[in-house]
Structures are given as C-alpha cells and as structure tokens.
Amino acid sequence: MSRPILVFDSGIGGLSVLAEIRKSLPHSDYCYLFDNARLPYGELEEQVLIAGCVALVCDLVARTNAMIVVVACNTASTVVLPALRANLSIPVVGVVPAIKPAAQMSKSKRIGLLATPGTVKRHYTHSLISQFADDCHVELFGCSELVMMAEQKIATGEMDMHRLADLLAPVVAAQLDVLVLGCTHFPMIQAELQQVLGAGVTLMDSGAAIAKRVVTLLTQQNFIVEQRRVTNEREAVGESAMQAFYTKAEISEGLTTTLIDCGFSTIERITTTN
C-alpha cells in the first residue's frame, strides 16, 4: 500500500466525500476511518470531541503513513481542525457548507441550510452566511435524526419516507430554491430528500469542492508526483487499496456489505485510550 488518503467521519457520511475524491484520484490508496462508537458528534462536548478525534486520527496517520487527512464531517470540521493541524505535519482538509455557491445559484434569493443542530448554531456557519449570502434570506434547519436515518439506510436499505416527510415539512414550507446539505451524511439520502422536496429545490453539497482542494494540496506538497507513479502502476493491475476502520464494538452485516461493495478489502475495528 502506498501512502493513502485518509478520510475521517463519525459515520458513513464521509463515503460521499471519498467517492468524489476517487473521481479525481481513482488509483490512489484510501483509508476510511469512521468513529461510529461516538456517533452523532453533534451531541458531544467540544473538548471530548477534540480529544477523541485527535487521538484516533493521529494514531491512524502514524500507522498508515497517510499523506493527507480529509475531515469529512461538518461538525468535526468546525471544532477539531485547529487541533488536528497542530498535531500533524501533513495537510488537513475540512468541510465547508456550500453557502457561497448556493447564494450565487439562487434565483429567488431564498436558500436554506440543512445540517446538524451543532453546525447550525456555530458562529462559523453564521459567519459564512454573513460573508457570502448577505443578499439572501437564509433558513437554517438543524436535524440529528436525519444522520441516523442515513446510517439506517446504508445498513438496511430501508428509509421511512413518512418520517422523512415530517422532518422536512419546515423545509418545504420555507419555499426555497436551493438547499445546502450541510452534513456529509445527507448526500447518501439525496434521492429521498429530492423526492420529498420536489424538483424545484436544488440540493448542493461540498463533495466536489473538497476533492478539488485535495488535488490542489497534494500538488503543492509534491505528493502528486507520487500519485502519478501510483496511477501508472495501478492502471496495469486495475485496482487500488481500500481500508476501512471503525470504533464501535461491531457493525451490522448490511454495513459490512456496503463497505465491501464500495471496494474496501480490509474492514477493521480500532480502539483508542481517549
């Protein structure tokens, strides 16, 4: 395994970000770390969240010799990034809600942000709105239950559409033309969200922008030279190495199947003392 790209989230939402990165770097090696023992992150005290994330990520970076870390979690990105960057010598990329492109795309100038309550209430989010959407009416919707519904869908293939419609009723009533998906879990249920909200609402997430940032940073750090070498080798054999790591005592058979279908050949539980 060459130096991997490490993607980190509390659950399976980061798979949506990993998929976007793989479109740009299809022959790279990847590690996916999901801290499902502490899901959802939005309900944790900030210092507890920071200590746990730093311990987990730094341990796995040392173990795998990762060349970049992607924090594919909006909650962790607003809380943990400074501590991770202080403890790591490699680039660390976070997630930024797509407020700016949403404001630029909106014709009605009525946009919304659907995220966890933690992301909705943080000063960073309101700063983005003030900076990039001051000409828009912005509605904020915080919902942790959608995170667990996305996890449930991936694990079982099932989605309670009646409950989803109830949760999205305030979004429908707001009469928006663009809705920002401010949690990386939400692209995993984008089809269901679109079904409830209708074709008149454009859904936007940050996956493509994150992938672009990863490529830029790898280029600046000269890691892209290594990536080209790996690409040439992988084109000959037609595969890349994919490893998944989780923190819960066990994961469901359905989730294991999903990870295998995504290309992960190694699925392993890891623990930390923090």
UniProtKB/Swiss-Prot annotation:
GO biological process annotation, one example = cell wall organization
A Pfam family cross-referenced in the UniProt record is Asp_Glu_race
Reaction(s) this enzyme catalyzes, per UniProt: L-glutamate = D-glutamate
The record's annotation in Gene3D superfamilies points to: 3.40.50.1860
The residue ranges crossing the membrane are none
Where, by residue number, does substrate bind? D9, S10, Y41, G42, N74, T75, T184, H185
Query: Residues in the active site?
Result: C73, C183
Q: Which family does it belong to?
A: Belongs to the aspartate/glutamate racemases family.
* UniProt-listed HAMAP family: Glu_racemase (MF_00258)
Q: What is this protein called?
A: Glutamate racemase
